[in-house]
Amino acid sequence: MTDLTPREIVSELDRFIIGQKDAKRAVAVALRNRWRRKQLPDDLRDEVHPKNILMIGPTGVGKTEISRRLAKLARAPFIKVEATKFTEVGYVGRDVEQIVRDLVDTAIVQTREHMREDVKAKAHKAAEDRVLEAIAGTDARESTLEMFRKKLKAGELDDTVIELDIADTSNPMGGMFEIPGQPGANMGMMNLGDLFGKAMGGRTTRKKLTVAESYDVLIGEEADKLLDDETVNKAALEAVEQNGIVFLDEIDKVCARSDARGGDVSREGVQRDLLPLIEGTTVSTKHGPVKTDHILFIASGAFHIAKPSDLLPELQGRLPIRVNLRALSEEDFVRILTETDNALTRQYEALLGTEKVKVTFTKDGIHALAQIAAEVNHTVENIGARRLYTVMERVFEEMSFAAPDRSGEEIIVDEPFVTKNLGELTKSTDLSRYVL
């Protein structure tokens, strides 16, 4: 898991998300507390439970983006799910325990990757031997093998096509046992392909690959041979229990509004099912039981129609840290277009650059784009930073279409260029309502 300090986590998030200081600080402290807990003695460590977070803010202000970036920083088992995908236990659909099962599957892949790194040197040597055997044959002399080994290391044989027996990962048995009417609810049973594969010593298929292509496949295979499945699973389950993070998006969509009448199976029932999961329970998975006591839950929602107080009181109590994210202003849009590492301006420059069209954004052009986005958000519907996608796409619509014919040209995106492509639409509220 990560040992970054809260300040380092916030500065890393600042590269991609503008503003929202409170939300960044809250997730940074929560992430650092995972590390702090690991430093405690065993008896105290079990008593320290994570403080779950509820992020409240309009759409398009960075709630989901914070979760995506956090996943890369955490270096811990992380899963992002939409609360709307789940239904109450007993109804057709996925129940909330599937969240933990999916988290375990993610952790196993992640743990296997880390453990592969530890045995990479041995796996590389074994892969090299298999490639040499395929090139020189099984009964080649030592001197011949050494000659080929030198050529292999020099990269002279990279384009040579060889035939290899590769482990067949396709599953003719149709995968998991499915319960009729409940997709994804495989009850933690073992994959049939795994069962039969292990019983029969694993199936292989003969493939033609170049030497360069074969290396990745063979190193992965040889590393897996050196790894013990039981050790991988045990380490993954422990990582989930101690460091797991679940990001629950769209939590407001499972609120039963205070003025609503009648039952709704996908709303209050889902909240009730989430209670034990967040509080701490044991979930059965195909790799073994998982305790959820120390998994960190971060919930987020726009709460346009429902209010946070419409959540079940017990669920509110289990999400003690509340963070409000503010709506974005015109100044924020300017910063989003200029300061972030993945700015839309850079993306369009790179995309059209592939057609040999040079795109240059001027300061007044960026301000014009930000002003139009903020204006349409204010007059039509506030969808936050996502409005920039729409505005930019409309501005570059003609340019993107004609780019192959204008190779070698330079396009200056200034205020007149933006006004020419968008001006009329922004003046007419009726038009912008449907087009922007």
From Swiss-Prot:
Subcellular location: Cytoplasm
Pfam families recorded: AAA, AAA_2
GO cellular component: HslUV protease complex
Domain of life, source organism: Bacteria
Keywords: ATP-binding, Chaperone, Cytoplasm, Nucleotide-binding, Stress response
Biological process annotations from GO: protein unfolding; proteolysis involved in protein catabolic process
A GO molecular-function descriptor: ATP binding
Binding-site residues, ATP: I18, G60, V61, G62, K63, T64, E65, D249, E314, R386
InterPro entries hit by this protein: AAA+_ATPase, ATP-dep_Clp_protease_ClpX, ATPase_AAA_core, Clp_ATPase_C, HslU, P-loop_NTPase
Entries under SUPFAM superfamilies matching the protein: P-loop containing nucleoside triphosphate hydrolases (SSF52540)
Bilayer-crossing regions: none
Role description: ATPase subunit of a proteasome-like degradation complex; this subunit has chaperone activity. The binding of ATP and its subsequent hydrolysis by HslU are essential for unfolding of protein substrates subsequently hydrolyzed by HslV. HslU recognizes the N-terminal part of its protein substrates and unfolds these before they are guided to HslV for hydrolysis.
Subunit description: A double ring-shaped homohexamer of HslV is capped on each side by a ring-shaped HslU homohexamer. The assembly of the HslU/HslV complex is dependent on binding of ATP.
Family membership noted in the UniProt record: Belongs to the ClpX chaperone family. HslU subfamily.
Name this protein carries in UniProt: ATP-dependent protease ATPase subunit HslU
Organism: Ruegeria sp. (strain TM1040)
Gene label: hslU
